[in-house]
Amino acid sequence: MFTSKPAFKIKNKASKSYRNTAVSKKLKEKRLAEHVRPSCFNIIRPLKKDIQIPVPSSRFLNKIQIHRIASGSQNTQFRQFNKTSIKSSKKYLNSFMAFRAYYSQFGSGVKQNVLSSLLAEEWHADKMQHGIWDYFAQQYNFINPGFGFVEWLTNNYAEVRGDGYWEDVFVHLAL
């Protein structure tokens, strides 16, 4: 039953640390700029002079009002968030998350599953707004103010502001 031979054989492989890590000849011959794709960089766009928070469409607001009436809730006020309960998220905000965070305040009194479908429908209805919300999300992620997106957005973009110059990052960090 017992044998002196092993039941299996281990095959020795070359360690990854011994692999050739030198730069290939092709890369040495060409400039580095030719190998770098522009999509690798996160470019923060300058503040735009004329950018404003998009107003929700009347169709969207009418649908929300219909669902409020159907559910028996006539609460038309925006949700008030408790500032102590908002925690700064480590996750990066994308354009749809920014859109959803801002527009969901118009749907207070509507069930969450209904509101989610209305927001998704509104998002797909107007593709021109995607760039604006992407801009807001990039700015928020870059600045990382330490408080909620909706509060940051209303503080910074409720009115047209700025002269279109590049943002001074240190000013935002000091705030």
Swiss-Prot record:
Q: Does the keyword Nucleus apply?
A: yes
Q: Where in the cell is it found?
A: Nucleus
DNA-binding region at which residues?
Answer: 88-144
* PROSITE patterns documented for this protein: ALPHA_BOX
Q: Which domain of life is it from?
A: Eukaryota
Q: Which GO terms describe its cellular component?
A: nucleus; RNA polymerase II transcription regulator complex
Which GO terms of the molecular function aspect are on file? Answer: DNA binding, bending; transcription coactivator activity
Under Pfam families, the record lists: MATalpha_HMGbox
**What is known about what this protein does?**
Mating type proteins are sequence specific DNA-binding proteins that act as master switches in yeast differentiation by controlling gene expression in a cell type-specific fashion. Transcriptional coactivator that, in alpha-cells, binds cooperatively with MCM1 and STE12 to a DNA sequence termed the QP' element, to activate the transcription of alpha-specific genes.
Q: What else is known?
A: There are three genetic loci for mating type genes in S.cerevisiae. MAT is the expression locus that determines the mating type of the cell, whereas HML (containing HMLALPHA1 and HMLALPHA2) and HMR (containing HMRA1 and HMRA2) represent silenced repositories of mating type information. The mating type is determined by the MAT locus, which contains either a copy of HML or of HMR. Diploid cells are usually heterozygous for the MAT locus.
Describe the subunit structure: Binds DNA with a high specificity in complex with an MCM1 dimer. Interacts with STE12.
Annotated protein name in UniProt: Mating-type protein ALPHA1
What organism does the record attribute this protein to? Saccharomyces cerevisiae (strain ATCC 204508 / S288c) (Baker's yeast)
What gene name is listed for this protein?
Answer: MATALPHA1
